[in-house]
Amino acid sequence: MIRVRWARLGAWFFAAATLISVGRPSLAVDWPTRPVRFIVTLGAASGVDIGARLFADRLSAQWKQPIVVENRPGGDGILAITSFLSAHDDHTVLVTPVAAFTAHPYFHDPVPYDAEKLTPIARISNTVVAVAVPTSLNVNSLKDLEALARAQPGKLNWTTATGFTDFVFAGYLHTVGLKMEKVPYKNPAGAVTDLASGTIQVYMPAYAIVRPQVQAGAVKVLAVTNHERFSGLPNIPTAVEAGYPSLEFDGLVGIFASPEMNAETRAKIAQDVRSVANDPAILERMTATGQIVSPGEGAEFEASIEKQKAPIAEVAKLFGNKPVQ
């Protein structure tokens, strides 16, 4: 009897010691200890903002701390990024499309922040990016669009958001050998209005921006640039499927840390983001905003960013733009 009790007691101590060694408290376990800030590079009600708020709501419940979402749109994402880095705070993270900063070296000399200080924590989603045309243009595919552009060189107008997507579409035109005229817009609402009326013929934005006009029948999506089809547009091909690989890119969106955040905390956040991403309710809401839920932790997210940088560098060289050293 005594032997059994000592055996049981010994087993209990062994189990307790094992739990202590495995679950030893770390900075990651103790984080967060106060409210967290999400700084978002885009404005309220954008797809990225909606996604940030959905994740913030679920993470706040897990972490038992409030999460404040701050929108800092403008300046090609630079306003939000510089504000984030100047906080020097391990309870502040940046939520942004990767495109917000990967093209900065080609447009800003000097770049007003150190990109090496942006550490990828977790990918949240891929924003669906659409190649959209007015329905009145009477084209039903990218092949049709190419044929029309060849028949009317320089007569068709196009636009995208400034920066990353500029390079992608310009690279596509160069690769295919088409001539279209770019029309710059400061406000996406103006571009959508002009697209629906036929004033411009091609617009390549986040699908969420043109979705109301697509549903109204005034705008048509010819393809999505993402590497996989979007469940919200099951009959629309990817650019690669349509025969135009130069248009392929994913609208990567993720969470970034500043140098003040340690690796253990970053790993905790990434793990918690993945658990939220697996929630069917989150998947449904994100799909409704034109986003593909695509969780990826630190190293995987960083690899996807690097993969996206390479083709943009090649396109930049075509137009004489060189990265700022």
Which ranges hold each PLM region?
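An extracytoplasmic/periplasmic, membrane-proximal ligand-sensing/linker region
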Residues: T33-P35, T175-L178, A263-Q325
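C-terminal lobe and pocket-closing loops
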Residues: D114, V210-N278, K307-A310, V324-Q325
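N-terminal signal peptide c-region/cleavage motif recognized by signal peptidases
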Residues: G23-P25
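N-terminal secretory signal peptides that target proteins for export/translocation
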Residues: M1-W6
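A ligand-binding cleft/hinge motif common to bilobed small-molecule-binding domains
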Residues: A99-D109, D166, A170-T175, V202-I236, ...
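N-terminal (or domain-start) structured segment
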Residues: L27-K117, K155, F164-T165, G177-V202, ...
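Bacterial N-terminal signal peptides
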Residues: G10-S21
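Hinge/capping helix and adjacent helix->loop/strand transition within the periplasmic-binding protein
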Residues: S86-H91, Y106-G190, A239-E241, L252-R285
